[in-house]
């Protein structure tokens, strides 16, 4: 065992996931008085042979589908598409898959009384918004809408978009969900989705992304019903080709008003043609300032597509949406939050999710870690079995405990970085380009403005998606057990990489 960087001989050898945290691994696995239970629900706008994947005609249908869970004390913490439907990716069957993450408190015996828990219901509101190049205008418009709803007692959950569907799906179902023939459609769905994964995207995807995705629809199928916008990139000033919804938890009784604000989100991007093939972002540098102030990271907003006629940018500017003072998170009254950020490969077999962040999430739930946001990306690849895989970024938080607070002193580097300060900080590639992945395999010591000394990055290099779960991301007694405590010795101001 050593800390030499492994050369990625093949794209399939890239890491199944990386974990970044403001804590060392032993602190992450320290139990608190609170724990969570999670329920993960998958939805599809298409027919599916898997009974565990819930068929919906619109993302608005999710509201009714989760009602029974709300009666059991669960609330939705995040709703997100499985892949980021950008450009031709909107034609992929997987672009019609959505995930809802629900959680409920698992109280200790001394907190067994549930009287403090308020009954909530899920609410979705359409949010007309133009996807202009400048994120500042979008941020102000969105934040005004979110804060206006918060004053009515609505707790913000996130944003979810739905692209317009073609009149015929890959499974042969019509736009309104009526199938030509039930048995035929189910078989057609499975065959066509398999064709997309194994054939249509071919070798391009195993490298870095979809260079050119063939159009399976005929001319008449490429035209949307009811004169809906086409799949083409929007022109400047036009709305994106879909709808954007704001998701809230609304409470029956009067609730304290929540307040929300935006924070910087900046990502460097690598492209092959117009396709985004890799991302670089310093997640903890961007968010730690807010976590230390007791804010909760709720969601993010990024305009992934470039208006026609514009030069393709080398970076994407968006914003995170934070809830002030961690409102609604048990025990976080004006206390800072510790954070975990997971870069996770999610594998899709056919039209169904095969491997994802679920096992890790259930393990961390026992230690009081709350999932607050999932950022899907447009980065795609094939695993060794020919299945589609996409990169997702998962954000979890937990109120700072006395021990962790004592070992994470405030440093001048724990602040919001802007402009050239942010560019000084080294970053880790999320993409599939072999050279970028090699460079990202280890993080060099940070320059001035570095992270606090206890901030960690955990990584294990294994071939992804060859079994039901990734090695190191399994549903064993401890997902993190393979990480040796002794590997977390580090020097002042240096973020370490655990090399296996």
From Swiss-Prot:
Disruption phenotype: Double RFTN1 and RFTN2 mutant mice show no visible phenotype under pathogen-free conditions but show greatly reduced interferon beta production in splenic dendritic cells under poly(I:C) or lipopolysaccharide stimulation. Keywords: Cell membrane, Lipoprotein, Membrane, Myristate, Palmitate, Phosphoprotein. Residues 213-224, 409-424 have a biased composition (Basic and acidic residues). Pfam families: Raftlin (PF15250). The modification Phosphothreonine is found at residue 408. Expressed in B-cells, heart, brain, spleen, large intestine and lung. Expressed in dendritic cells and macrophages. Residues 203-236, 406-500 are annotated as: Disordered. Residues 467-478 have a biased composition (Low complexity). It is a lipid-anchor. One of its GO terms (cellular component) is plasma membrane. It is found in: Cell membrane. GO terms for biological process: dsRNA transport; response to exogenous dsRNA. The modification Phosphoserine is found at residues 404, 429. Residues 426-438 have a biased composition (Polar residues). Coiled coil: none annotated. A lipid is attached at residue 3 (S-palmitoyl cysteine). Its main location: membrane. A lipid is attached at residue 2 (N-myristoyl glycine). It comes from the Eukaryota. Belongs to the raftlin family. Upon bacterial lipopolysaccharide stimulation, mediates clathrin-dependent internalization of TLR4 in dendritic cells, resulting in activation of TICAM1-mediated signaling and subsequent IFNB1 production. May regulate B-cell antigen receptor-mediated signaling. This is Raftlin-2.
């Amino acid at each position: 065992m050593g800390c030499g960087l492994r050369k990625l001989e093949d794209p399939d050898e890239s890491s199944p996931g990386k974990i970044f945290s403001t804590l060392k691994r032993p602190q992450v696995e320290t139990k608190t008085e609170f724990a969570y239970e999670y329920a993960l629900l998958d939805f599809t706008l298409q027919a599916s042979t898997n009974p565990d994947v819930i068929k919906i005609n619109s993302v608005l249908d999710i509201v009714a589908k989760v009602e029974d869970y709300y009666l059991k004390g669960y609330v939705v913490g995040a709703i997100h598409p499985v892949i980021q439907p950008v450009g031709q990716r909107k034609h992929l069957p997987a672009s019609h898959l959505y995930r809802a993450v629900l959680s409920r408190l698992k109280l200790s015996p001394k907190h067994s009384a549930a009287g403090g828990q308020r009954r909530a219901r899920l609410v979705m509101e359409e949010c007309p918004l133009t996807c202009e190049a400048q994120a500042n205008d979008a941020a102000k418009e969105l934040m005004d809408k979110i804060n206006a709803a918060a004053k009515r007692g609505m707790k913000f959950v996130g944003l979810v978009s739905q692209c317009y569907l073609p009149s015929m799906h890959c499974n042969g179902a019509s736009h309104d969900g009526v199938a030509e023939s039930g048995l035929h459609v189910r078989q057609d769905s499975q065959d066509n989705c398999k064709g997309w994964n194994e054939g249509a995207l071919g070798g391009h995807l195993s490298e870095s992304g979809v260079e050119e995705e063939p159009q399976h629809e005929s001319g008449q199928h490429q035209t949307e019903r009811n004169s809906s916008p086409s799949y083409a990139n929007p022109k400047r000033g036009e709305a994106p080709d879909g709808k954007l919804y704001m998701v809230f938890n609304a409470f029956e009784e009067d609730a304290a008003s929540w307040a929300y604000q935006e924070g910087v989100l900046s990502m460097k991007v690598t492209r092959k043609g117009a396709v985004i093939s890799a991302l670089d972002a310093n997640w903890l540098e961007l968010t730690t300032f807010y976590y230390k102030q007791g804010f909760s990271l709720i969601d993010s907003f990024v305009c992934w597509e470039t208006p026609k006629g514009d030069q393709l940018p080398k970076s994407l500017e968006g914003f995170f949406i934070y809830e002030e003072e961690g409102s609604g998170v048990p025990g976080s009254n004006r206390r800072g939050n510790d954070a975990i950020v997971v870069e996770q490969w999610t594998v899709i077999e056919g039209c169904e999710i095969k491997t994802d962040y679920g096992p890790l999430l259930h393990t961390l739930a026992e230690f009081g870690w709350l999932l607050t946001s999932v950022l899907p990306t447009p980065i795609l690849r094939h695993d060794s079995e020919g299945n589609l895989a996409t990169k997702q970024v998962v954000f979890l938080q937990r109120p700072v405990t006395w021990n962790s607070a004592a070992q994470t002193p405030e440093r001048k580097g724990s602040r919001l970085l802007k402009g050239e300060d942010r560019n000084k900080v080294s970053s880790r590639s999320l993409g599939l380009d072999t050279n970028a992945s090699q460079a990202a395999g280890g993080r060099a010591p940070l320059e001035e403005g570095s992270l606090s000394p206890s901030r960690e990055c955990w990584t294990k290099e294994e071939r992804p998606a060859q079994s039901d779960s990734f090695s190191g991301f399994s549903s064993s007694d401890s997902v993190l057990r393979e990480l040796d405590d002794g590997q977390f010795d580090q020097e002042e101001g240096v973020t370490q990489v655990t090399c296996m």
